[in-house]
């Protein structure tokens, strides 16, 4: 049988498989393989017993509701609960904005880029960013432009942001995509004054801000949470994205967008085209969980669980770095970013990691440009056990030492 020739749309020509998911397919399944890679929650984080109890109530009270077609916007009760929490705990304006329940936060960003990005438009991001956002932007013919990240300021370079927008005389830049709280992959949180500055610059140039906040509830340090960029928004210039994946279960595929009402209406239209509505069973389950239990108590449990893991990883890195690595200490979230010293050969380092059965995420995978951060790698501390964290960091230290010894001297 001859091979059929398919004429695919030009918008998919430049897309590549998500490198994080591709890497997952090829991870060695050796018994002692330690994965410090994926942004997965711990299995200990899932409120299994509570969900089992309330599932009986959901089946009894809402069986026909979740088996039938549903509202695109999401079930009213869950949307109201989200609004109440955002208003009470984040001081966000829920009167001039509305909540759309999405099929995971990934769909949320897809919908936003779908309504704002035309072929040839530009979306600004941090230089190191979530790879899923990069693919979503490219899928609509958009160009991803990474802004320099100021590690000392824990923020994008706001001078570069201002200069970039001032130079955009054709108004091709449509959205600034940011993860300002516990950034992925770096782990830092943008300071309050930088958030205000970013908002002011984008408002002046009429560029939408997409504030992606999947980790925002997971603050482990004894500090006051930094206000969201959305909390400054009085003119409808910010779309705020939240998720249940990191605080309930990624299998729920529940996310949400808080968007200005005019934007909300367009998002609803696009979601009707995409999948009509998010999983109704999980919407009712999440809503019932919030009704029947203290959801803040559940989040506090997650903070305690993950703080111990983060502290263990930080302590292990501090003990085992041996002047070969430096790392960012986050206040929360899922990740720690590590930088290898320049005298370590990265190719050899990753080969040594593979031989030692340890998985990390290389920095170039998380780069907006797909390159340029070869000396960096990302570690996840939420999924592995404490023992795996300690052993994993020890193996990483050994790999770094081996790579340092083999690097050819510069002549």
Model regions: which residues?
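Conserved PLP-binding catalytic core of the aspartate aminotransferase-like
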Residues: 324-357
């Amino acid at each position: 049988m001859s091979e059929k020739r398919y004429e695919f749309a030009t918008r998919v020509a430049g897309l590549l498989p998500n490198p994080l998911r591709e890497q997952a397919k090829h991870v060695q399944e050796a018994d002692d393989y330690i994965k410090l890679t994926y942004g997965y929650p711990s299995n200990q984080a899932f409120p299994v017993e509570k969900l089992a109890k309330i599932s009986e109530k959901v089946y009894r009270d809402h069986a026909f509701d979740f088996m039938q077609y549903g509202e695109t916007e999401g079930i009213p009760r869950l949307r109201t609960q989200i609004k109440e929490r955002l208003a009470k705990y984040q001081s966000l304006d829920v009167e001039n904005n509305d909540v759309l329940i999405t099929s995971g936060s990934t769909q949320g960003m897809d919908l936003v880029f779908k309504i704002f990005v035309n072929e040839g438009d530009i979306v600004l991001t941090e230089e190191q960013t979530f790879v899923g956002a990069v693919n979503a932007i490219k899928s609509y013919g958009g160009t991803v432009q990474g802004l320099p990240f100021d590690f000392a300021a824990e923020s994008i370079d706001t001078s570069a942001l201002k200069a970039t927008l001032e130079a955009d005389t054709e108004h091709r830049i449509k959205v600034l995509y940011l993860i300002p709280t516990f950034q992925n992959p770096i782990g830092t949180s943008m300071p309050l004054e930088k958030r205000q500055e970013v908002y002011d610059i984008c408002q002046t140039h009429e560029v939408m801000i997409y504030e992606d906040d999947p980790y925002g509830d997971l603050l482990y340090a004894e500090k006051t949470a930094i206000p969201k960029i959305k909390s400054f928004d009085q003119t409808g210039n910010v779309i705020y994205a939240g998720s249940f994946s990191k605080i309930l279960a990624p299998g729920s595929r529940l996310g949400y967008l808080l968007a200005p009402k005019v934007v909300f209406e367009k998002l609803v239209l696009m979601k009707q085209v995409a999948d009509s509505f998010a999983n109704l069973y999980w919407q009712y389950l999440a809503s019932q969980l919030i009704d029947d239990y203290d959801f803040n108590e559940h989040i506090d449990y997650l903070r305690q669980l993950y703080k111990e893991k983060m502290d263990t990883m930080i302590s292990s890195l501090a003990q085992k770095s041996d002047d070969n690595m430096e790392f960012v200490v986050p206040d929360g979230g899922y990740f720690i970013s590590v930088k290898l010293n320049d005298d370590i050969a990265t190719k050899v380092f990753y080969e040594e990691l593979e031989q030692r059965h340890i998985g990390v995420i290389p920095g170039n995978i998380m780069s907006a440009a797909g390159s340029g951060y070869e000396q960096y790698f990302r570690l996840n501390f939420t999924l592995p056990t404490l023992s795996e964290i300690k052993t994993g960091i020890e193996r990483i230290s050994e790999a770094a030492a081996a790579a340092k010894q083999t690097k050819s001297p510069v002549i």
